[in-house]
């Protein structure tokens, strides 16, 4: 039997580094550097002791803290211009249905709770193995349009995240109750709490209180105040009522400039585009070329990302032209940014079959499934596309669907257009700015 390397489908089943019941894929140095800054075993006193602690404060004592000059600007929300990461901490930047994401220095760290009863640890590696496999097999600049994780740790104990969330939630509850002169209690209504938190989170007085209480009560280098309401929705969702937040994966990524959905007209022009619509054409074209080149690879005409949408496309600096050859044409991108496909958690390619999606798809799909969903989400994210009649009319060719064959933008029926459909589409004058360098 030959030796499997990371350009082979078998790579996902390899276990290069073992630490008891955990596995590290990729660069151990990156991974261990991040892990050395995390305390996976941090514990706190029971909530009742926190309640007793807050009995030492009232509206008057909180007022004295508010009058203090000290303020930790990292407790502002990240979209607030006053936000500044003054410590080398983990800053919460996103929580979605399948991961909790933090930023530290030039890294992005994603924690994913896995259903260990459904999948073995090695069956949850697609987010690392699929992009790595594609990057190593693609031969041209198209490989630059993929986000590869630097490292991935499998089967790590992640209970500390849920414990930390509960500790911060209790602190916020008791702090808000003290501010309002209410009787202290750890019982709460989701609607009432979120309303109270959202009303205060941008207040400089509230941030001063957080600057005092977060270090004293939480004493952690993980700051979850940013976008805390997203974390709240994740952990409090009724479908996770009996969920065991036990084990999962830790993935280390390079830090991007933005996700594609964050670009508006002002930012598009700042990035060097003539308009927002030109920027949208740019990301569409780069993703289309990536798919075409993947489908050219042997045995890769089954590639599915399964969640191709603007917020799963990241933008990075591009220090040199990206040139991609297709038949007798070459596509030249001189922009100072590039788009790169991210979040391969539900993807499959070649012999790397993903059990997470295998049972969800009742019919066979190919690239068209992804682009049908992509176009729907582009039009929803950017209604400005409609102003470009030629472009918007062309995009409608991807979404000629009805309620019977499309549910929440996702195809329910098998439509297997050949990849030549996409090849012909991107040869149109719509993309003339990039075809043969715009000549």
Curated annotation (Swiss-Prot):
EC nos? 2.7.11.1
The record's subcellular location field reads: Host endoplasmic reticulum; Host endoplasmic reticulum-Golgi intermediate compartment
Q: What is this protein called?
A: Serine/threonine-protein kinase 2
What's a single GO CC term here? host cell endoplasmic reticulum
Which residues of the sequence carry a binding annotation for ATP? 93-101, 117
Protein source organism: Vaccinia virus (strain Tian Tan) (VACV)
What post-translational changes are documented for it? Phosphorylated in vivo. Autophosphorylated in vitro.
Report whether Transmembrane helix shows up as a keyword of the record: no
Function statement: Essential serine-protein kinase involved in the early stage of virion morphogenesis.
Query: What InterPro entries does the record tag this protein with?
Result: Poxvirus_ser/thr_kinase (IPR008790), Prot_kinase_dom (IPR000719), Ser/Thr_kinase_AS (IPR008271)
The text of the family note is: Belongs to the protein kinase superfamily. Ser/Thr protein kinase family.
Q: Name one GO molecular function term.
A: ATP binding
């Amino acid at each position: 039997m030959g030796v499997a390397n990371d350009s082979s489908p078998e790579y996902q089943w390899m276990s290069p580094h073992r630490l008891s019941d955990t596995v590290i894929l990729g660069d151990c140095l990156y991974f261990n550097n991040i892990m050395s800054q995390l305390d996976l075993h941090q514990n706190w006193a029971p909530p009742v002791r926190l309640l007793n602690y807050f009995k030492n404060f009232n509206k008057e004592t909180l007022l004295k803290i508010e009058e203090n000059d000290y303020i930790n600007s990292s407790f502002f929300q990240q979209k607030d211009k006053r936000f500044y990461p003054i410590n080398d901490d983990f800053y919460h930047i996103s929580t979605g249905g399948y991961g909790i994401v933090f930023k530290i220095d030039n890294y992005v760290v994603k924690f994913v709770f896995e259903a260990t009863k459904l999948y073995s640890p090695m069956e949850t590696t697609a987010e690392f193995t699929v992009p790595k496999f594609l990057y190593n097999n693609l031969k041209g600049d198209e490989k630059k349009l993929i986000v590869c994780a630097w490292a991935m740790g499998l089967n790590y104990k992640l209970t500390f995240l849920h414990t930390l969330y509960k500790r911060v939630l209790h602190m916020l509850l008791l702090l808000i109750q003290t501010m309002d002169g209410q009787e202290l209690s750890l019982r709460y209504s989701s609607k009432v709490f979120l309303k109270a938190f959202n009303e205060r989170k941008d207040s400089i007085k509230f941030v001063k209180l957080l600057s005092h209480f977060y270090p004293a009560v939480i004493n952690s280098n993980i700051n979850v105040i940013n976008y805390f309401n997203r974390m709240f929705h994740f952990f409090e969702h009724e479908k996770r009522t009996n969920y065991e937040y036990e084990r999962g994966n830790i993935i280390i990524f390079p830090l991007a400039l933005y996700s594609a959905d964050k670009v508006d007209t002002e930012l598009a022009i700042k990035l060097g585009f003539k308009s927002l619509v030109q920027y949208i054409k740019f990301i569409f074209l780069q993703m289309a070329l990536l798919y075409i080149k993947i489908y050219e690879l042997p045995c890769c005409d089954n590639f599915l990302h399964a969640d191709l949408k603007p917020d799963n496309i990241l933008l990075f600096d591009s220090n040199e032209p990206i040139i991609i050859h297709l038949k007798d044409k070459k596509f030249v991108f001189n922009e100072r940014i590039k788009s790169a496909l991210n979040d391969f958690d539900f993807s499959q390619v070649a012999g790397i079959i993903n059990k997470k999606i295998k049972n969800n798809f009742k019919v066979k799909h190919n690239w068209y499934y992804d682009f049908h969903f992509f176009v729907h989400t582009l039009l929803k994210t950017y209604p400005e596309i409609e102003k470009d009649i030629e472009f918007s009319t062309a995009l409608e060719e991807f979404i000629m669907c009805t309620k019977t064959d499309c549910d929440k933008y996702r195809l329910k029926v098998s439509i297997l257009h050949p990849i030549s459909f996409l090849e012909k589409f991107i040869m149109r004058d719509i993309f003339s700015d990039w075809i043969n360098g715009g000549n």
